[in-house]
Amino acid sequence: MPALPTPALPTPALPTPAFPAPALHPVDPEKATGETASLFTATHRALGVIPQLARVMANNPTVLRGYVDVVTALSTRGTLSADVRERIALLVAQENRSDYCLSVHTFRGTKVAGLTTAEATRARRGEAGDPWAAAVLDLAAAVVRDHGVVSDERLDAARHAGLSDGHVVEIIAHVALGVFTHHLATAARIDIDWPLVRHTDWENGTA
């Protein structure tokens, strides 16, 4: 999601607004001061844009700071590669039927993390050709679908595939981030400011 420490990208083409008005008002970067302004600067440096989701988070700078810090820590010091992180995000977004998060992570997954369009689509289904990524997605799918309940058999399979307890904790952290951003984007009713991807795309044969 927004504020990942990656090279700036061209401003994505924006789809037609979906909502007549947001439920939570985004903070205008031009009017931001203090810590909020600094966080916006860091976000723009990373992404080349300041997404609507970050602007909504900025209503509470502590939340925005915490989100940025967690995402930055996982991205720079975590054990999961960028492509695996984006696969998890795509899976969680699809399970949540989150068009906002799907739009963000399809763009980031294919433009930043190096996923092909086919790999991004497979990730939404919880599938991957790489055995390691497949094991990660299998566990992430269990976490998001069963609300954190993971069977002994599932954990045994994860460990057999080479995942440590540390990996499991890190995967759950990424799932939680995806759930948080989905709920915030949905509650705020913000417009999608990334190239639009709908959770129904593959049902219509367009994914």
Question: Which positions does each model-derived feature cover?
Answer:
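Hydrophobic alpha-helical segments
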Residues: 1-207
